[in-house]
Design a protein with these regions (language model features):
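Short phosphate-engaging motifs
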Residues: 198-201, 213
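Alpha-helical transmembrane bundle of multi-pass membrane proteins
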Residues: 1-198, 205, 226-440
Length: 440
């Protein structure tokens, strides 16, 4: 990429995805020890693990408003600072209720980062490389997940009653680094114009990003703002925005009813259900992280070449096949291929939904409601993540794996129909031209 500053800013903001992934997956190595330490019932245990996801719901709900009021840069700074508070507080908690408070704070940060980071990157990135740059956020999520699994395995092999505290507390180190780096980025030029009417500052930022296209981009943003002022801004939940709202809702809904967060949160438990020993199950979870990373790299490298819709189609087919095989393995109790089937599922997710979701949601809304649209898509994602993660231990214990994974497979069949018949291609389209492109 020619513009090093654009890449540097995008990478810096995408590091919030690393914190997102690390904090999301690190709990998988700690959850069983936490249950044993505080003698938690299955219901309270499920709540203690899912409480972070409930935090993501509120973080996503208010993330767009917060990013509009304070700016993308300040919002990202506070995300990093509160990630640090959550990591340290969770690690030193002496009872489950204190633990849940700090995990909830971490969830707020995850939810907010899933709104503000893709939003910021999409607003500074040129159309030709926007998919790649926004997808760096997802790459960092899966890199964080892989590091969490490796960290969990290393701390588990060291043994000791407090290894779970180290698993959670380690998140504080990258949190501090990210917080400091946010001070070095510039504010989004679109936010400067739309929220502050600061055209001069926006022009300076656009010149830093790409001097050759700065004037054209500035004119396009100002034209969009002028049209919006002339026509008036409709309420978010209005007929005018119904189609992008539906698109965002469905891609976020299908992301979670694939079962991805159930697998990530409870990976060791899923492998133990299939008969693996505890240490082997935790090590297999490291394989999940590595598979996720490799295929996310592939998806990120292809998203601006083949487009969002093609990757979603490939991922949907992979989902259906792998989930059906997992369900069959539980039904027949023949688990020889279970590890491979789960890895295939992760690969399908990484190259499809994983690479596409945050890019797609950040693109499909007009400038005047982009923050609200990003927040809505993220909110939908986290509401269903919280529900599925909370009920997964109960249903897996009561019914086993077969009906759960059949349900996920059927839902991915529905996703395939969504991709085929509804999803527009957004590759290479300028943000200000997106409204015309997707026909709403």
């Amino acid at each position: 990429m020619k513009n090093k500053k654009l890449l540097l800013w995008s990478l810096t903001v995408a590091l919030s995805g690393f914190l997102f992934g690390l904090d999301t997956a690190v709990i998988s190595g700690a959850e069983q020890k936490i249950q044993a330490l505080w003698s938690l019932s299955n219901a309270l245990h499920g709540l203690a693990i899912a409480i972070a996801l409930y935090g993501t719901v509120f973080g996503a709900m208010f993330g767009g408003w917060y990013a509009d009021k304070l700016g993308r840069k300040k919002a990202l700074f506070w995300v990093g600072a509160l990630f640090f508070v959550s990591a340290v507080g969770s690690a030193i908690s002496q009872d489950v209720y204190t633990f849940m408070v700090f995990r909830f704070i971490g969830g707020l940060c995850i939810g907010a980062s899933s709104v503000v980071s893709p939003l910021y990157i999409s607003e500074i990135a040129p159309a030709k490389s926007r998919g790649f740059l926004v997808a760096l956020f997802q790459f960092n999520i899966v890199f964080g997940i892989m590091i969490a699994y490796v960290s969990n395995y290393l701390f588990q092999t060291m043994g000791g009653e407090s290894d779970w505290r180290w698993m959670l507390g380690i998140v504080g180190i990258p949190s501090l680094i990210f917080t400091g780096l946010t001070l070095l980025i510039s504010e989004s030029p679109r936010w400067l114009i739309l929220q502050k009417n600061d055209i001069e500052s926006a022009k300076l930022v656009l010149n830093e990003i790409d001097p050759e296209t700065a004037d054209k981009t500035l004119a396009s943003i100002l034209h969009s703002k002028s049209n919006n002022a002339k026509n008036g801004t409709a309420k978010f939940f209005s007929k005018k925005y119904a189609f992008p709202i539906l698109l965002a809702f469905l891609i976020a809904f299908f992301n979670q009813v694939s079962g991805i967060n159930a697998i990530i949160y409870y990976a060791p438990r899923v492998f133990e259900m299939s008969g693996l020993a505890k240490s082997s199950a935790l090590l297999s979870s490291v394989g999940i992280g590595l598979t996720n990373l490799i295929f996310t790299m592939l998806g990120v490298s292809l998203i601006d070449k083949f487009g969002r819709k093609t990757l979603m189609f490939i991922g949907s087919v992979g989902y259906i096949i792998s989930l059906t095989l997992i369900a069959k393995a539980f039904y027949t109790e023949q688990f020889d291929g279970m590890t491979f089937f789960v890895f295939a599922f992760i690969a399908a997710h990484a190259i499809g939904q994983g690479a596409v979701i945050w890019v797609f949601i950040s693109e499909i809304f007009p400038n005047e409601i982009r923050a609200s649209g990003q927040a809505f898509g993220s909110l939908t994602h986290w509401v269903f993540a919280a529900i599925i993660t909370n009920v997964f231990p109960y249903f897996s214990g009561k019914f086993g794996g077969t009906p759960i994974f059949i349900f996920f497979a059927v839902m991915m069949g529905c996703q395939l129909l969504y991709v085929w018949f509804m999803m527009p291609e957004t590759k290479g389209v300028a943000l200000e031209d997106m409204e015309m492109q997707i026909g709403h």
